[in-house]
């Protein structure tokens, strides 16, 4: 992988194979996607497929549901993505992966499931607040726990400037 250029719906990737420089379109969000795609392409080629055949279908690849998935496009041009990140590292990676594709603010809507590891909740909030421009904290399957307490655990150590809290997930979104 030599270079990538990003836009709101994907990326152009520039890579070398067998001494030839290729430029191909990936309709996938996140720089890491190019690395994954090229690794998969190398495996397919190593199993006997023709490189040109493999490279010519890269633009047809689609993301896995719930992973950097384009869910909607707003009338104002904003894109809405879904990623089921559920750890601090995954939230940080997801938001950072979006940044090159975004020409305005990133608004992250996050929550934490109930009856799960409570120690990661403040870290999830911190990861979101350090990487997004605005963070909206909402409920995400609280199970047997009090949803308000889960939200408070996520936001307890955060500056309130760009943090919003909504118990109703639909309202938050």
What are the residue ranges of the model-derived segments?
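Conserved phosphate-donor/acceptor-positioning beta-strand/loop module used by diverse small-molecule
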Residues: 3, 83, 138
């Amino acid at each position: 992988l030599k270079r990538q250029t990003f836009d709101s719906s994907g990326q152009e990737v520039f890579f070398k194979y067998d001494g030839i420089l290729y430029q191909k379109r990936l309709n996938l969000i996140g720089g890491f996607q190019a690395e994954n795609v090229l690794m998969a392409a190398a495996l397919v080629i190593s199993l006997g497929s023709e490189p040109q055949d493999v490279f010519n279908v890269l633009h047809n690849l689609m993301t896995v549901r719930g992973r950097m998935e384009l869910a909607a496009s707003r009338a104002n041009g904003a894109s809405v993505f879904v990623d089921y990140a559920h750890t601090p590292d995954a939230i940080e990676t997801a938001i950072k992966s979006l940044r090159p594709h975004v020409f305005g603010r990133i608004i992250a809507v996050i929550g934490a499931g109930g009856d799960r590891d409570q120690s990661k909740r403040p870290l999830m909030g911190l990861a979101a607040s350090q990487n997004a421009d605005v963070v909206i904290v909402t409920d995400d399957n609280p199970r047997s726990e009090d949803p308000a307490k889960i939200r408070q655990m996520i936001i307890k150590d955060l500056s309130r400037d760009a943090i919003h809290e909504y118990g109703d997930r639909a309202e938050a979104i």
